[in-house]
Amino acid sequence: MFTLPQKDFRAPTTCLGPTCMQDLGSSHGEDLEGECSRKLDQKLPELRGVGDPAMISSDTSYLSSRGRMIKWFWDSAEEGYRTYHMDEYDEDKNPSGIINLGTSENKLCFDLLSWRLSQRDMQRVEPSLLQYADWRGHLFLREEVAKFLSFYCKSPVPLRPENVVVLNGGASLFSALATVLCEAGEAFLIPTPYYGAITQHVCLYGNIRLAYVYLDSEVTGLDTRPFQLTVEKLEMALREAHSEGVKVKGLILISPQNPLGDVYSPEELQEYLVFAKRHRLHVIVDEVYMLSVFEKSVGYRSVLSLERLPDPQRTHVMWATSKDFGMSGLRFGTLYTENQDVATAVASLCRYHGLSGLVQYQMAQLLRDRDWINQVYLPENHARLKAAHTYVSEELRALGIPFLSRGAGFFIWVDLRKYLPKGTFEEEMLLWRRFLDNKVLLSFGKAFECKEPGWFRFVFSDQVHRLCLGMQRVQQVLAGKSQVAEDPRPSQSQEPSDQRR
């Protein structure tokens, strides 16, 4: 398999340098401003976080109010993803199809994973794997999960298998936790921008709301970085929710953060947990990217590494293989909580969100193979992630586009505000549609409830030829020259320099 070589990464010869940026921004901005003004009266569809589910409407008479809300999410929030799957790029069958730089998946290590999952020790069928199991998961798997998390989270004491529940993915974990922790209409605090699908996870079953903790790109006051979360901002958001009559039951934290890539320090984690204890709030900590920190200078620490949790009965940690092991299709996620009432309630919902016995066996085999993980998979995965991140970063710098440079996750938070003349979400949506029309799917800031229009998430964890082609199509849109770029590679070439016109 071709590994993205860092030394081969160069800015494309077709990139517009800094001297061109003023003209590029000006001509495109005037065009976008005119198009936006023509469409303002048409009321573009809006992607909302569920501040108030009652705002969602649908005309169908066949569905319950809950069903109408679920259908609304499918019709609106999934538009780009559905469009992509109807016109998916294939270098042989559909070279002018859509390049997906919007979905956060790791597509860099299929060769390593396919080899490991096809080994003989993965192939086992016995009666116990074909029958109903403990809804928390087979004991052999929960034991391996506890050992795995103890090692990689650097827990000061061994984690216990009785505190582990396994489900079919992180989405199910969010849904189950929200349902068992909150009454309908209650809320979780969540810093924004945040992984927008959490809105669906907590709302579609449990009708749980999200109370936003808005973060700013400007560094002000005591902040030391853009979009910094502080206890003061948490307190303010909590007061605002209470003033609106919303009961807040918990706080959702993501570390490494999606879409920012930020990693919370142990001191920050402790401050957030103390805040939550003070207000008797549950804390859901999503650490699904914990093994995808590819810069050695980034000092990642799991919440489970803390010597003492301020409120262990209200602290619930999530992890899954979908990101760190590039297995979003296998649907494996795990919850670690010391609260046995919560664990039992979530386990009961595993009747609807459980894993097959065969998948549980494979996951146990994978997680116990510490030699392969440490000596083969993680070093190579980190090297490929770093190389891909370097390439996209250099492309953005060549275009004079600001972005947050972090060393974790699969994405870069990109600032395209200068391409929005009036700085509106309508313009952001129009720019997103231009990207999609030019066959490149990105994620726009409103989908993450970013308060400032013009931010986009670029996913870089993909093969080099798709990254090159996707960035070429992005450049065409920003230059006001939208046209579908096809893969110009010779059939045997894999070098970035040979993939550009």
From Swiss-Prot:
SUPFAM superfamilies membership: PLP-dependent transferases (SSF53383)
GO BP terms: amino acid metabolic process; biosynthetic process
Region (Disordered): 480-501
Resulting phenotype, residue 221 to E: In a breast cancer sample; somatic mutation
One term of GO molecular function: pyridoxal phosphate binding
Domain of life from the UniProt record: Eukaryota
Modified residues (N6-(pyridoxal phosphate)lysine): 323
Bias-annotated ranges (Polar residues): 490-501
UniProt binding sites for substrate: 105
Result of changing residue 393 to L: In a breast cancer sample; somatic mutation
Keyword Transcription regulation recorded: no
Listed InterPro entries: Aminotransferase_I/II_large, Ethylene_sulfur-biosynth, PyrdxlP-dep_Trfase, PyrdxlP-dep_Trfase_major, PyrdxlP-dep_Trfase_small
Pfam families cross-referenced by the UniProt entry: Aminotran_1_2
Alphabetically ordered keywords of this record: Pyridoxal phosphate
PANTHER family in UniProt: 1-AMINOCYCLOPROPANE-1-CARBOXYLATE SYNTHASE-LIKE PROTEIN 1, BIFUNCTIONAL ASPARTATE AMINOTRANSFERASE AND GLUTAMATE/ASPARTATE-PREPHENATE AMINOTRANSFERASE-RELATED
Homology family: Belongs to the class-I pyridoxal-phosphate-dependent aminotransferase family.
Primary role: Does not catalyze the synthesis of 1-aminocyclopropane-1-carboxylate but is capable of catalyzing the deamination of L-vinylglycine.
Protein name per UniProt: 1-aminocyclopropane-1-carboxylate synthase-like protein 1
Organism: Homo sapiens (Human)
Gene behind the chain: ACCS
